[in-house]
Protein backbone atom coordinates (compact mmCIF):
# COMPACT_ATOMS: atom_id res chain seq x y z
CA UNK A 1 0.00 0.00 0.00
CA UNK A 2 2.64 2.51 1.04
CA UNK A 3 4.90 1.57 -1.85
CA UNK A 4 2.06 1.77 -4.35
CA UNK A 5 1.19 5.33 -3.43
CA UNK A 6 4.66 6.87 -4.01
CA UNK A 7 4.94 5.04 -7.34
CA UNK A 8 1.66 6.46 -8.58
CA UNK A 9 2.67 9.95 -7.44
CA UNK A 10 5.93 9.77 -9.35
CA UNK A 11 4.19 8.67 -12.52
CA UNK A 12 1.76 11.57 -12.26
CA UNK A 13 4.64 14.06 -11.80
CA UNK A 14 6.45 12.66 -14.78
CA UNK A 15 3.40 12.92 -17.01
CA UNK A 16 2.70 16.45 -15.85
CA UNK A 17 6.24 17.54 -16.64
CA UNK A 18 6.02 16.11 -20.13
CA UNK A 19 2.69 17.77 -20.74
CA UNK A 20 4.03 21.06 -19.50
CA UNK A 21 6.97 20.74 -21.88
CA UNK A 22 4.62 19.94 -24.74
CA UNK A 23 2.33 22.88 -23.94
CA UNK A 24 5.25 25.26 -23.63
CA UNK A 25 6.63 24.05 -26.97
CA UNK A 26 3.30 24.57 -28.66
CA UNK A 27 2.94 28.04 -27.15
CA UNK A 28 6.46 29.00 -28.22
CA UNK A 29 5.91 27.76 -31.74
CA UNK A 30 2.58 29.57 -31.94
CA UNK A 31 4.22 32.79 -30.82
CA UNK A 32 7.07 32.39 -33.31
CA UNK A 33 4.66 31.62 -36.12
CA UNK A 34 2.44 34.60 -35.34
CA UNK A 35 5.47 36.89 -35.01
CA UNK A 36 6.93 35.82 -38.34
CA UNK A 37 3.51 36.17 -40.00
CA UNK A 38 3.26 39.71 -38.68
CA UNK A 39 6.75 40.51 -39.97
CA UNK A 40 5.92 39.06 -43.37
CA UNK A 41 2.70 41.04 -43.48
CA UNK A 42 4.56 44.25 -42.62
CA UNK A 43 7.01 43.61 -45.45
CA UNK A 44 4.22 42.86 -47.88
CA UNK A 45 2.33 45.98 -46.92
CA UNK A 46 5.52 47.99 -47.25
CA UNK A 47 4.42 51.54 -47.89
CA UNK A 48 6.71 52.44 -50.82
CA UNK A 49 5.44 49.49 -52.82
CA UNK A 50 1.83 50.50 -52.38
CA UNK A 51 2.58 54.11 -53.23
CA UNK A 52 4.60 52.99 -56.24
CA UNK A 53 1.55 51.10 -57.49
CA UNK A 54 -0.66 54.12 -56.92
CA UNK A 55 1.73 56.50 -58.66
CA UNK A 56 1.87 54.17 -61.63
CA UNK A 57 -1.66 55.28 -62.50
CA UNK A 58 -0.77 59.01 -62.42
CA UNK A 59 2.79 59.28 -63.73
CA UNK A 60 4.94 57.61 -66.34
CA UNK A 61 8.36 58.73 -65.10
CA UNK A 62 10.05 58.97 -61.71
CA UNK A 63 13.40 60.57 -60.95
CA UNK A 64 15.23 59.18 -57.93
CA UNK A 65 18.11 60.84 -56.14
CA UNK A 66 20.70 59.22 -53.95
CA UNK A 67 20.15 60.14 -50.30
CA UNK A 68 23.30 61.01 -48.39
CA UNK A 69 21.69 60.44 -45.03
CA UNK A 70 19.99 57.07 -45.07
CA UNK A 71 16.40 57.29 -43.93
CA UNK A 72 15.79 53.91 -42.33
CA UNK A 73 18.14 52.25 -44.81
CA UNK A 74 16.33 53.71 -47.80
CA UNK A 75 19.03 55.06 -50.08
CA UNK A 76 16.90 56.60 -52.83
CA UNK A 77 14.17 59.21 -52.78
CA UNK A 78 11.90 59.63 -55.79
CA UNK A 79 9.64 62.26 -57.26
CA UNK A 80 7.64 62.16 -60.48
CA UNK A 81 9.44 63.71 -63.42
CA UNK A 82 9.11 67.52 -63.58
CA UNK A 83 8.31 67.66 -59.86
CA UNK A 84 10.81 69.46 -57.66
CA UNK A 85 12.20 67.72 -54.57
CA UNK A 86 12.76 69.53 -51.29
CA UNK A 87 13.12 67.99 -47.84
CA UNK A 88 10.88 64.94 -47.80
CA UNK A 89 8.39 66.26 -50.37
CA UNK A 90 7.89 66.76 -54.09
CA UNK A 91 6.29 69.90 -55.50
CA UNK A 92 4.52 70.72 -58.74
CA UNK A 93 3.26 74.07 -59.96
CA UNK A 94 0.02 73.84 -61.88
CA UNK A 95 -0.10 76.62 -64.46
CA UNK A 96 -2.07 75.01 -67.27
CA UNK A 97 -5.25 76.76 -66.23
CA UNK A 98 -6.63 78.70 -63.32
CA UNK A 99 -9.27 77.07 -61.19
CA UNK A 100 -11.22 77.42 -57.97
CA UNK A 101 -9.79 75.96 -54.80
CA UNK A 102 -11.90 72.81 -55.04
CA UNK A 103 -10.94 72.27 -58.66
CA UNK A 104 -7.29 72.91 -57.82
CA UNK A 105 -7.34 70.28 -55.10
CA UNK A 106 -9.01 67.86 -57.49
CA UNK A 107 -6.23 68.43 -60.01
CA UNK A 108 -3.63 67.72 -57.34
CA UNK A 109 -5.48 64.55 -56.34
CA UNK A 110 -5.45 63.41 -59.95
CA UNK A 111 -1.67 63.52 -59.67
CA UNK A 112 -1.61 61.56 -56.42
CA UNK A 113 -0.95 64.73 -54.44
CA UNK A 114 -2.70 67.56 -52.57
CA UNK A 115 -2.50 71.34 -52.38
CA UNK A 116 0.70 72.42 -50.72
CA UNK A 117 1.06 72.48 -46.95
CA UNK A 118 3.80 74.87 -45.85
CA UNK A 119 5.72 73.90 -42.72
CA UNK A 120 8.58 76.38 -42.60
CA UNK A 121 10.08 79.55 -44.02
CA UNK A 122 12.71 77.51 -45.86
CA UNK A 123 10.01 75.48 -47.53
CA UNK A 124 8.10 78.59 -48.57
CA UNK A 125 11.31 80.16 -49.90
CA UNK A 126 11.96 77.06 -51.97
CA UNK A 127 8.41 76.97 -53.34
CA UNK A 128 8.33 80.64 -54.27
CA UNK A 129 11.51 80.30 -56.32
CA UNK A 130 9.41 78.24 -58.74
CA UNK A 131 6.60 80.76 -58.95
CA UNK A 132 5.66 83.67 -61.18
CA UNK A 133 5.40 86.89 -59.19
CA UNK A 134 2.46 88.02 -61.33
CA UNK A 135 0.24 85.10 -60.34
CA UNK A 136 -1.48 83.79 -57.23
CA UNK A 137 -1.33 80.16 -56.12
CA UNK A 138 -3.78 78.24 -53.96
CA UNK A 139 -2.28 76.49 -50.96
CA UNK A 140 -3.92 73.74 -48.94
CA UNK A 141 -5.23 76.01 -46.19
CA UNK A 142 -8.83 76.98 -45.52
CA UNK A 143 -11.04 78.46 -42.82
CA UNK A 144 -13.54 75.89 -41.60
CA UNK A 145 -15.41 78.60 -39.72
CA UNK A 146 -14.76 81.35 -37.15
CA UNK A 147 -11.20 81.90 -38.38
CA UNK A 148 -10.25 78.30 -37.64
CA UNK A 149 -7.61 77.68 -40.27
CA UNK A 150 -6.99 74.08 -41.23
CA UNK A 151 -4.41 72.41 -43.45
CA UNK A 152 -5.76 70.01 -46.03
CA UNK A 153 -3.62 67.11 -44.77
CA UNK A 154 -4.60 67.70 -41.11
CA UNK A 155 -1.22 69.15 -40.17
CA UNK A 156 -1.90 71.24 -37.06
CA UNK A 157 -2.10 74.95 -37.89
CA UNK A 158 0.92 76.54 -36.23
CA UNK A 159 0.65 80.29 -35.62
CA UNK A 160 4.42 80.55 -35.51
CA UNK A 161 4.77 79.07 -38.99
CA UNK A 162 2.39 81.34 -40.86
CA UNK A 163 3.36 83.82 -43.54
CA UNK A 164 0.36 86.10 -43.97
CA UNK A 165 0.87 89.38 -45.73
CA UNK A 166 0.57 92.38 -43.45
CA UNK A 167 -3.05 92.98 -42.56
CA UNK A 168 -4.13 89.49 -43.63
CA UNK A 169 -6.32 87.58 -43.18
CA UNK A 170 -8.75 90.46 -43.53
CA UNK A 171 -12.20 89.10 -44.41
CA UNK A 172 -14.24 86.48 -42.60
CA UNK A 173 -15.99 85.45 -45.81
CA UNK A 174 -12.71 84.81 -47.63
CA UNK A 175 -12.10 81.24 -46.55
CA UNK A 176 -9.33 80.08 -48.88
CA UNK A 177 -5.69 81.09 -49.16
CA UNK A 178 -3.32 81.93 -51.97
CA UNK A 179 0.39 82.56 -52.00
CA UNK A 180 1.13 85.73 -53.89
CA UNK A 181 3.79 88.37 -54.37
CA UNK A 182 3.19 91.80 -52.91
CA UNK A 183 5.72 94.63 -53.17
CA UNK A 184 8.91 92.82 -52.17
CA UNK A 185 7.80 89.53 -50.75
CA UNK A 186 5.71 86.42 -51.04
CA UNK A 187 3.00 85.87 -48.48
CA UNK A 188 -0.45 84.54 -47.83
CA UNK A 189 -3.69 86.23 -48.70
CA UNK A 190 -7.21 85.04 -47.90
CA UNK A 191 -9.53 85.01 -50.91
CA UNK A 192 -12.90 83.71 -51.97
CA UNK A 193 -12.76 79.96 -52.62
CA UNK A 194 -14.47 80.33 -56.00
CA UNK A 195 -11.83 82.73 -57.31
CA UNK A 196 -9.72 81.12 -60.02
CA UNK A 197 -5.97 80.90 -59.42
CA UNK A 198 -2.98 78.71 -60.12
CA UNK A 199 -1.91 76.18 -57.51
CA UNK A 200 1.00 74.28 -56.01
CA UNK A 201 0.72 70.52 -55.47
CA UNK A 202 2.71 68.55 -52.93
CA UNK A 203 3.27 64.87 -52.25
CA UNK A 204 5.58 62.91 -50.01
CA UNK A 205 8.69 61.52 -51.62
CA UNK A 206 8.88 57.79 -52.20
CA UNK A 207 11.84 56.22 -50.44
CA UNK A 208 13.43 53.08 -51.82
CA UNK B 1 -8.45 -8.28 -12.95
CA UNK B 2 -10.27 -8.07 -16.24
CA UNK B 3 -11.73 -4.70 -15.31
CA UNK B 4 -8.33 -3.44 -14.26
CA UNK B 5 -6.86 -4.42 -17.59
CA UNK B 6 -9.62 -2.72 -19.53
CA UNK B 7 -9.24 0.38 -17.42
CA UNK B 8 -5.49 0.49 -17.98
CA UNK B 9 -5.94 -0.09 -21.71
CA UNK B 10 -8.37 2.79 -22.04
CA UNK B 11 -6.01 5.08 -20.13
CA UNK B 12 -3.11 4.24 -22.39
CA UNK B 13 -5.21 4.86 -25.53
CA UNK B 14 -6.36 8.20 -24.22
CA UNK B 15 -2.83 9.29 -23.34
CA UNK B 16 -1.50 8.18 -26.72
CA UNK B 17 -4.18 10.16 -28.52
CA UNK B 18 -3.35 13.28 -26.56
CA UNK B 19 0.35 12.89 -27.19
CA UNK B 20 -0.27 12.32 -30.86
CA UNK B 21 -2.33 15.49 -31.02
CA UNK B 22 0.40 17.41 -29.20
CA UNK B 23 3.16 16.12 -31.45
CA UNK B 24 1.13 16.78 -34.59
CA UNK B 25 0.41 20.32 -33.38
CA UNK B 26 4.07 20.94 -32.78
CA UNK B 27 5.01 19.57 -36.19
CA UNK B 28 2.39 21.71 -37.90
CA UNK B 29 3.48 24.83 -36.07
CA UNK B 30 7.12 24.11 -36.83
CA UNK B 31 6.31 23.72 -40.51
CA UNK B 32 4.29 26.93 -40.57
CA UNK B 33 6.99 28.81 -38.74
CA UNK B 34 9.73 27.59 -41.07
CA UNK B 35 7.59 28.35 -44.13
CA UNK B 36 6.85 31.89 -43.01
CA UNK B 37 10.51 32.43 -42.13
CA UNK B 38 11.47 31.36 -45.64
CA UNK B 39 8.91 33.75 -47.13
CA UNK B 40 10.19 36.58 -44.96
CA UNK B 41 13.76 35.80 -45.97
CA UNK B 42 12.76 35.93 -49.63
CA UNK B 43 11.27 39.38 -49.10
CA UNK B 44 14.28 40.64 -47.23
CA UNK B 45 16.67 39.29 -49.83
CA UNK B 46 14.54 40.85 -52.56
CA UNK B 47 16.81 41.54 -55.50
CA UNK B 48 15.69 45.13 -56.18
CA UNK B 49 16.59 46.24 -52.66
CA UNK B 50 20.07 44.82 -52.90
CA UNK B 51 20.70 46.18 -56.38
CA UNK B 52 19.26 49.55 -55.35
CA UNK B 53 21.78 49.65 -52.55
CA UNK B 54 24.64 48.67 -54.85
CA UNK B 55 23.70 51.29 -57.44
CA UNK B 56 23.65 53.88 -54.69
CA UNK B 57 27.44 53.64 -54.57
CA UNK B 58 27.86 54.17 -58.34
CA UNK B 59 25.15 56.65 -59.32
CA UNK B 60 23.51 59.72 -57.85
CA UNK B 61 20.21 59.55 -59.69
CA UNK B 62 17.86 57.10 -61.37
CA UNK B 63 15.07 57.52 -63.88
CA UNK B 64 12.16 55.09 -63.63
CA UNK B 65 9.71 54.47 -66.43
CA UNK B 66 6.23 53.12 -66.01
CA UNK B 67 6.14 49.68 -67.62
CA UNK B 68 2.93 48.94 -69.45
CA UNK B 69 3.28 45.20 -69.14
CA UNK B 70 3.69 44.38 -65.48
CA UNK B 71 6.73 42.22 -64.89
CA UNK B 72 5.71 40.12 -61.91
CA UNK B 73 3.73 43.03 -60.46
CA UNK B 74 6.71 45.36 -60.70
CA UNK B 75 5.44 48.47 -62.43
CA UNK B 76 8.55 50.59 -62.74
CA UNK B 77 11.75 49.93 -64.66
CA UNK B 78 14.71 52.04 -63.51
CA UNK B 79 17.99 53.03 -65.12
CA UNK B 80 20.66 55.41 -63.90
CA UNK B 81 20.25 58.93 -65.25
CA UNK B 82 21.63 59.43 -68.77
CA UNK B 83 21.51 55.70 -69.46
CA UNK B 84 19.28 54.59 -72.32
CA UNK B 85 16.48 52.17 -71.62
CA UNK B 86 15.51 49.30 -73.91
CA UNK B 87 13.76 46.03 -73.10
CA UNK B 88 14.96 44.89 -69.70
CA UNK B 89 18.37 46.59 -69.88
CA UNK B 90 20.02 49.99 -69.54
CA UNK B 91 22.83 51.16 -71.83
CA UNK B 92 25.54 53.79 -71.66
CA UNK B 93 27.73 54.77 -74.61
CA UNK B 94 31.23 55.51 -73.41
CA UNK B 95 33.02 58.23 -75.34
CA UNK B 96 36.50 57.36 -74.07
CA UNK B 97 38.76 55.14 -76.14
CA UNK B 98 40.35 52.36 -74.13
CA UNK B 99 41.65 48.80 -74.24
CA UNK B 100 39.01 46.11 -74.02
CA UNK B 101 39.86 45.05 -70.47
CA UNK B 102 39.95 48.66 -69.26
CA UNK B 103 36.60 49.30 -70.93
CA UNK B 104 35.12 46.33 -69.09
CA UNK B 105 36.61 47.53 -65.79
CA UNK B 106 35.05 50.93 -66.35
CA UNK B 107 31.66 49.30 -66.91
CA UNK B 108 32.04 47.18 -63.79
CA UNK B 109 32.79 50.30 -61.79
CA UNK B 110 29.34 51.52 -62.75
CA UNK B 111 27.66 48.26 -61.78
CA UNK B 112 27.48 47.11 -65.40
CA UNK B 113 29.42 45.15 -68.04
CA UNK B 114 30.27 45.50 -71.72
CA UNK B 115 27.18 45.07 -73.85
CA UNK B 116 25.83 41.63 -74.72
CA UNK B 117 23.66 41.64 -77.83
CA UNK B 118 20.80 39.15 -77.72
CA UNK B 119 18.47 40.24 -80.52
CA UNK B 120 18.44 42.15 -83.78
CA UNK B 121 16.05 44.66 -82.23
CA UNK B 122 18.56 45.26 -79.47
CA UNK B 123 21.38 45.79 -81.94
CA UNK B 124 19.19 48.16 -83.96
CA UNK B 125 18.39 50.15 -80.84
CA UNK B 126 22.04 50.35 -79.81
CA UNK B 127 23.31 51.40 -83.22
CA UNK B 128 20.84 54.29 -83.27
CA UNK B 129 22.80 55.78 -80.38
CA UNK B 130 26.19 55.37 -82.04
CA UNK B 131 28.46 57.57 -84.11
CA UNK B 132 29.08 56.03 -87.52
CA UNK B 133 32.70 57.14 -87.59
CA UNK B 134 33.62 55.35 -84.37
CA UNK B 135 33.89 51.73 -83.27
CA UNK B 136 32.77 50.33 -79.95
CA UNK B 137 33.85 47.30 -77.90
CA UNK B 138 31.26 44.64 -77.20
CA UNK B 139 31.31 42.17 -74.31
CA UNK B 140 32.48 39.42 -76.68
CA UNK B 141 35.93 37.89 -76.79
CA UNK B 142 37.92 34.80 -77.76
CA UNK B 143 40.52 34.62 -74.97
CA UNK B 144 42.27 31.49 -76.30
CA UNK B 145 42.27 32.54 -79.95
CA UNK B 146 40.68 29.25 -80.96
CA UNK B 147 37.45 30.60 -82.40
CA UNK B 148 35.45 29.89 -79.22
CA UNK B 149 33.80 33.24 -78.73
CA UNK B 150 32.24 33.95 -75.38
CA UNK B 151 29.95 36.64 -74.04
CA UNK B 152 31.13 38.35 -70.90
CA UNK B 153 27.92 37.52 -68.99
CA UNK B 154 28.18 33.81 -69.93
CA UNK B 155 25.35 33.96 -72.47
CA UNK B 156 26.04 30.94 -74.72
CA UNK B 157 27.53 32.25 -77.97
CA UNK B 158 26.49 29.28 -80.08
CA UNK B 159 22.80 29.87 -79.45
CA UNK B 160 22.89 33.63 -79.67
CA UNK B 161 22.52 35.98 -82.62
CA UNK B 162 25.54 37.06 -84.68
CA UNK B 163 26.01 40.18 -86.73
CA UNK B 164 29.53 39.85 -88.08
CA UNK B 165 30.53 41.94 -91.04
CA UNK B 166 31.11 39.83 -94.19
CA UNK B 167 34.39 37.86 -93.98
CA UNK B 168 34.70 38.51 -90.25
CA UNK B 169 36.10 37.33 -87.93
CA UNK B 170 39.29 37.09 -89.95
CA UNK B 171 42.33 36.85 -87.65
CA UNK B 172 42.92 34.51 -84.67
CA UNK B 173 45.09 37.18 -83.07
CA UNK B 174 42.17 39.58 -82.97
CA UNK B 175 40.46 38.23 -79.88
CA UNK B 176 38.04 41.01 -79.03
CA UNK B 177 35.04 42.39 -80.88
CA UNK B 178 33.89 45.84 -81.82
CA UNK B 179 30.77 47.06 -83.55
CA UNK B 180 31.55 49.37 -86.43
CA UNK B 181 29.82 51.01 -89.40
CA UNK B 182 31.10 49.93 -92.83
CA UNK B 183 29.70 50.58 -96.25
CA UNK B 184 27.68 48.92 -97.63
CA UNK B 185 26.84 46.45 -94.84
CA UNK B 186 26.30 49.26 -92.28
CA UNK B 187 26.61 48.24 -88.63
CA UNK B 188 28.24 44.92 -87.87
CA UNK B 189 30.85 43.17 -85.79
CA UNK B 190 34.56 43.11 -86.41
CA UNK B 191 37.25 41.21 -84.53
CA UNK B 192 39.96 43.54 -83.26
CA UNK B 193 43.08 43.42 -81.11
CA UNK B 194 42.20 43.58 -77.42
CA UNK B 195 44.95 46.10 -76.81
CA UNK B 196 43.72 48.48 -79.48
CA UNK B 197 41.69 51.43 -78.25
CA UNK B 198 37.99 51.79 -78.97
CA UNK B 199 34.92 53.37 -77.47
CA UNK B 200 32.57 51.00 -75.67
CA UNK B 201 29.00 50.31 -74.63
CA UNK B 202 28.02 49.36 -71.07
CA UNK B 203 24.90 47.40 -70.21
CA UNK B 204 23.14 46.56 -66.97
CA UNK B 205 19.84 44.97 -66.11
CA UNK B 206 17.05 47.36 -65.21
CA UNK B 207 15.88 47.50 -61.63
CA UNK B 208 12.21 46.71 -61.38
CA UNK B 209 10.12 48.16 -58.56
Swiss-Prot record, chain B:
UniProt membrane topology term: Single-pass type II membrane protein
Keyword Membrane: yes
Gene Ontology MF: a single term: carbohydrate binding
Pfam families registered for this protein in UniProt: Lectin_C
Extracellular side stretches: 44-209
Positions bearing carbohydrate: 131
Tissue specificity of this protein: Expressed by the XS52 DC (dendritic cell) line (at protein level). Expressed constitutively by the epidermis, and skin resident DC appear to be the major source of this expression. Expressed in the spleen and thymus. Expression was undetectable in non-DC lines, including macrophage lines (J774 and Raw), T-cell lines (7-17, HDK-1, and D10), B-cell hybridoma (5C5), a keratinocyte line (Pam 212), and a fibroblast line (NS01).
Residues involved in alpha-D-mannopyranose binding: 168-170, 174, 182, 190-191
GO cellular component annotations of the record: plasma membrane
TM annotation in the entry: 21-43
Residues of the C-type lectin domain: 86-203
Binding site for Ca(2+) 2: 168, 170, 174, 190-191
Quaternary structure and interacting proteins, as annotated: Associated with FCER1G. Heterodimer with CLEC4D; this heterodimer forms a pattern recognition receptor (PRR) against fungal infection.
Function in brief: Calcium-dependent lectin that acts as a pattern recognition receptor (PRR) of the innate immune system: specifically recognizes and binds alpha-mannans on C.albicans hypheas. Binding of C.albicans alpha-mannans to this receptor complex leads to phosphorylation of the immunoreceptor tyrosine-based activation motif (ITAM) of FCER1G, triggering activation of SYK, CARD9 and NF-kappa-B, consequently driving maturation of antigen-presenting cells and shaping antigen-specific priming of T-cells toward effector T-helper 1 and T-helper 17 cell subtypes.
Record-given protein name: C-type lectin domain family 6 member A
Species name: Mus musculus
Amino acid sequence: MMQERPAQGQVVCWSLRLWMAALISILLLSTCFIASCVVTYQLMMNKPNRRLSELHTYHSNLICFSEGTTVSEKVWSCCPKDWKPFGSYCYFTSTDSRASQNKSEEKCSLRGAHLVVIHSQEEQDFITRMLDTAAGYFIGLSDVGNSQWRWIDQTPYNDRATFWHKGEPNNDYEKCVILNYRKTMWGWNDIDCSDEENSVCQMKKIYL
Amino acid sequence: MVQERQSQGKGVCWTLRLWSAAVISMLLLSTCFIASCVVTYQFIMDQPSRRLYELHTYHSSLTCFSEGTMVSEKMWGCCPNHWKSFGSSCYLISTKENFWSTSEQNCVQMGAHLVVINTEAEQNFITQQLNESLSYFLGLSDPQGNGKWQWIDDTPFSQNVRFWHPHEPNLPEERCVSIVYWNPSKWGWNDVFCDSKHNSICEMKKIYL
